[in-house]
Amino acid sequence: MSNEMKAGQDFLAANATKEGVIVTASGLQYRVMKSGQGATPGPTDVVMAHYHGTFIDGKVFDSSVERGEPLALPVNGVISGWTEALQMMQEGDQWQLFVPSDLAYGARGVGPIPGNTALIFEVELIEVK
């Protein structure tokens, strides 16, 4: 087992016990930071979202918030942890997602993200298009 995978598993095991953290059947963890009132997207919808992505040590790897530009994202064209979460969210929701590596980029990684890495995202669902 890689160091990244072990660190992610240890982090997620501890995180799952924290107040307000919900764990889904897939292993995705989330915490509702703010509740919205709007529409919930389906798998073929496109959403406008802001996000802030960090490693479990808090280091930022990508952030639409820092760029000041929300992104249009196809619900079924993002990592599977996001696809699952977005379909449970409503417009106006802000959630913190704790994504196991198998629901993120898996063993291959991508760009600055090594393989087998658990990731944390703060996601604001702005609009279902």
Task: Locate the predicted segments by residue.
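Cross-family detector of peptidyl-prolyl cis-trans isomerase
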Residues: 1-129
